[in-house]
UniProtKB/Swiss-Prot annotation:
Alphabetical list of SUPFAM superfamilies matching this protein: LDH C-terminal domain-like, NAD(P)-binding Rossmann-fold domains
EC number: 1.1.1.37
Membrane-spanning parts: none
HAMAP family reported in the protein's UniProt record: Malate_dehydrog_3 (MF_00487)
Listed Gene3D superfamilies: Lactate dehydrogenase/glycoside hydrolase, family 4, C-terminal, NAD(P)-binding Rossmann-like Domain
Protein name per Swiss-Prot or TrEMBL: Malate dehydrogenase
Organism: Jannaschia sp. (strain CCS1)
Role according to the record: Catalyzes the reversible oxidation of malate to oxaloacetate.
Reactions performed catalytically: (S)-malate + NAD(+) = oxaloacetate + NADH + H(+)
GO terms, biological process: lactate metabolic process; tricarboxylic acid cycle
Top-level taxon of the source organism: Bacteria
Family annotation (InterPro entries): L-lactate/malate_DH (IPR001557), Lactate/malate_DH_C (IPR022383), Lactate/malate_DH_N (IPR001236), Lactate_DH/Glyco_Ohase_4_C (IPR015955), Malate_DH_type3 (IPR011275), NAD(P)-bd_dom_sf (IPR036291)
Length: 320
């Protein structure tokens, strides 16, 4: 039986890391695509030459031709411009929208049956645009944001409580930006909700508020430290977690930017929500209950995403 085929659109820092992780996990054969001649080919060869030491069996190739992604089971899109210090994700809108058009058409023409995971920022608007340009079914196109934001939240919580990250669960919903909503009520340590841990004296509300804010600023913190790029290890790991859930039909409950039509009071839009990912793609949205305050924060985040979508329509009239 043929191995799954994984197409990685964009051979930058995230793309290269994705290729390495996919090979290490033996998720399938990898095609690394980029418009820069030599870059995907060089990275693919470098990773392939690590195979004998890492002991993985996976074909690794690089290309500048969309025809080579034909028949891909999974496409992960990282193509576009990354943030620099002082920039917000939203500042990338105009540049990366054009990239999504060419990528969407490339996937539509060559890998129309693929499960597509978008990482390009501003995430929620870009995954919406990518779906529009590609014409793929909504349940086969989603964005990687909530898994990453939740991982950052979990890391900060484990550090605060001095416990294993394996015992920390967390959910971050809403848009992938300053308005994201880390839900402390649905986040736990060994099943104990964070509000209970505050009552137990494990931490204070002030410290928890600071952790929530640091989670929102997680990407900007790394951009500020690197100065010449943005995060790539954690984003790549998060996208691989989603791809693995699809390829292995794991039915994982993961927060991601998915198409919502009816759940959570939303009608026909992409935004970060809890989902179940399996062989059917985004198989369902988990319609959680929110308090009045949580709903207000979520609504604010939804409004911010809608604003970016409207901006996309103003830039490219074919999206209207």
């Amino acid at each position: 039986m043929a191995r799954p085929k994984i197409a990685l659109i964009g051979a930058g820092q995230i793309g290269g890391t994705l290729a390495h992780l996919a090979a290490l996990k033996e998720l399938g054969d990898v095609v690394l695509f980029d418009i820069a001649e030599g870059v995907p080919q060089g990275k693919a060869l470098d990773i392939a030459e690590s195979g004998p030491s890492e002991k993985f069996d996976a074909d690794m190739s690089g290309t500048n031709d969309y025809a080579d992604i034909a028949g891909a089971d999974v496409c992960i899109v990282t193509a576009g411009v990354a943030r620099k210090p002082g920039m917000s994700r939203d500042d990338l809108l105009g540049i990366n929208l054009k990239v999504m058009k060419s990528v969407g058409e490339g996937i539509r023409d060559n890998a129309p049956d693929a499960f597509v995971i978008c990482i390009t920022n501003p995430l929620d608007a870009m995954v919406w645009a990518l779906r529009e340009f590609s014409g793929l079914p909504h349940h086969k196109v989603c964005g990687m944001a909530g898994v990453l934001d939740s991982a950052r939240f979990r890391h900060f919580l484990a550090d605060e409580f001095n416990v294993s990250m394996k015992d920390v669960t967390a959910f971050v919903l809403g848009g992938h930006g300053d308005t994201m909503v880390p839900l402390t009520r649905y986040s736990t340590v060994a099943g104990i909700p964070l509000p209970d841990l505050i009552e137990m004296g494990w931490t204070t509300q002030e410290k928890m508020d600071a952790i929530v804010q640091r989670t929102r600023d997680g990407g900007a913190e790394i951009v500020g430290l690197l100065k010449t790029g943005s995060a790539f290890y954690a984003p790549a790991t998060s996208a691989i977690e989603m791809a693995e859930a699809y390829l292995k039909d794991q039915k994982r409950v993961l927060p991601c930017a998915a198409y919502v039509d009816g759940a959570l009071g939303l009608k026909g839009m992409y935004v970060g929500v809890p989902t179940v990912i399996g062989a059917g793609g985004v198989e369902r949205v988990v319609d959680i209950n929110m308090t009045k305050d949580e709903q207000a924060m979520f609504d604010n985040s939804v409004a911010a995403v809608n604003g970016l979508v409207e901006a996309c329509k103003a830039i490219d009239e074919t999206l209207s």
